[in-house]
Amino acid sequence: MSKTAVVTGASSGIGAIYADRLAARGYDLVLVARRGERLATLAESLNKKYGIKAQPLVADLGNDADVAKVEKLLTSDPSIHMLVNNAGFGRLRSLADSSLDDSLSQIAVNITALTKLAHAALDGFRARKEGVLINIASVLAVHSLPISSVYSGTKAYVLAFSRGLQDELANTNIKVQVVLPGSTDTEIWTEGISGIPLSALSPERVMTAENCVDAALAGLDAGELVTWPSVADDGLWQTFDKTRQTLFDATQVGAPAPRYELSK
């Protein structure tokens, strides 16, 4: 049986490049996004270019009924070997300048839909005793700006969720990778989705979607659990992660810290 990869947010940017690269590796594809015309064009192009079977699945992952369609596919198709949880969006503005609906929409796509799809995919992976889950987070998972409180919060969830799954599935043939891109040349900037134009960013700080995905897949091949496509010194992450563990260990004390002087 041929292996199938499901890619969300596949109509452009990082998702479209994942679709291309996975097709080149011989995967059949299910391409998930809101824009049906773009999906159909991409699917046809990949079918011709690589001789694989790519099919579009039009779904808005901010809509519960559409998420359920993708969940059903993930639980019913035994050929599915990989899920790339790429769909997401961010509005970079202060909470005071954001509508509640907009903030909740980010949470619905970046957290709720991602979790539902991961849950559905992992059910199938466990039954088949193998699979690959790739969750796309962001460098803002570990850094907040005055304009990124909601977006950073959603991506911090993706990182923590993925790390927990990695521990949960450590002794299985199911791989979980979390990818944390920095600024990447995608429609989140060029189509005004973020609220900040691409021209406002220093060009040397912006990575192409192609380089981002190629680095992420190289990290997957190398067995990385956490991939930072733009970070040259991997020791920085190792130090960060070790410090996180040390801080957690320091919380496991049943008494207030001496600096609070509660004994006086």
Describe the role of every protein-language-model region.
Residues 11-12:
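Conserved glycine-rich cofactor-binding loop
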Residues 25-42:
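Conserved glycine-rich Rossmann-like NAD(P)H-binding loop of the short-chain dehydrogenase/reductase
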Residues 86-91:
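Conserved NAD(P)H cofactor-binding loop of Rossmann-fold oxidoreductase domains
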Residues 94-96, 102-107:
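Substrate-binding pocket helix/loop in short-chain dehydrogenase/reductase
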Residues 118, 154:
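Active-site helix of classical SDR
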Residues 138:
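Residue(s) in the substrate-gating loop at a strand-loop-helix junction
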Residues 178, 194-236:
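C-terminal helical subdomain
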